[in-house]
Amino acid sequence: MGNRVNAYTSDMDFHGGSKLSKLTYPIKTIYSKEARVQLRKVLDDFKPDVCHLNNFNYQLTPSIILEIVKWRKETGRDCKIIFTAHDYQLVCPNHQLKNPITHENCEKCLGGHFMNCVKGKCVHGSTAKSIVGMMEAEFWKWNGAYKYIDKIICCSEFLKTKMDTNPLFATKTIAMHNFVEKVEPKEVEKKDYVLYFGRFSEEKGINTLVETCNLLPDIQFIFAGSGPLEDKVNQLKNGVTRGYVLSLSCVNNT
């Protein structure tokens, strides 16, 4: 016996579409009536006991939280709202706690001071996009939709500490690391190399790792994954890129 599970998602094209859609997309990234209507159909059909939210900002938007709350009141169902925080979006409009122009770590928006996002051009280095990011954060701070979230799952203790800077979240967060299947240890041939697996992007610390690789030319580094900084990784003389590793044999054969 297991639990019944259903999923709802939506894709928004931020770069294509008509001129009208490009003009209206900033509003739709903040509040989506369409997402509320479509989610209501899922709620009425599935009648969930728990709604588990992931990365809803700018796509489904936090407006779906309001629809879940409305549905709960109208049906009398005790449906819990759980949110897994994969980044810092709820406390930082560019979700990275990092300025894309200076490449410096930044916590100026913590505590709800979202105007700093515009001052630093923190969303893609653009004033216009940063204004939209600031407006989105300020609107939902004013609206108070996040107070309806029952529990916030953070993927690390560090992420939890940053989420806890908002008193509204501090009593709701829990650190729960991403789980993996348990495997029995095996005897392997010892080889001298360093393995990185994950996305090749700035927020993952790839630039720092590349600098480290250059400082340690006698050590081999193996990279498993892909991402926007893949070209920089491929230029390493002591680095080997394996793409997405489907089995350990890809690494063992290196």
For each of these PLM feature ranges, what is it?
Residues 1-46, 227-229:
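N-terminal strand-loop element at the rim of the active site
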Residues 1-12, 44-46, 64-79, 211-214:
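N-terminal subdomain of nucleotide-sugar transferases
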Residues 70, 89, 101-151:
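Membrane-proximal helix-turn-helix segments that form the acceptor-binding/catalytic region
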Residues 82, 147-157:
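A short beta-strand/loop micro-motif in the catalytic core of glycosyltransferases
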Residues 153, 186-204, 209-216, 222:
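Conserved donor-binding/catalytic core segment of Leloir-type glycosyltransferases
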Residues 158, 179:
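Carbohydrate-associated surface elements
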Residues 230-251:
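Nucleotide-activated donor-binding/catalytic signature segment of Leloir-type glycosyltransferases, i.e.
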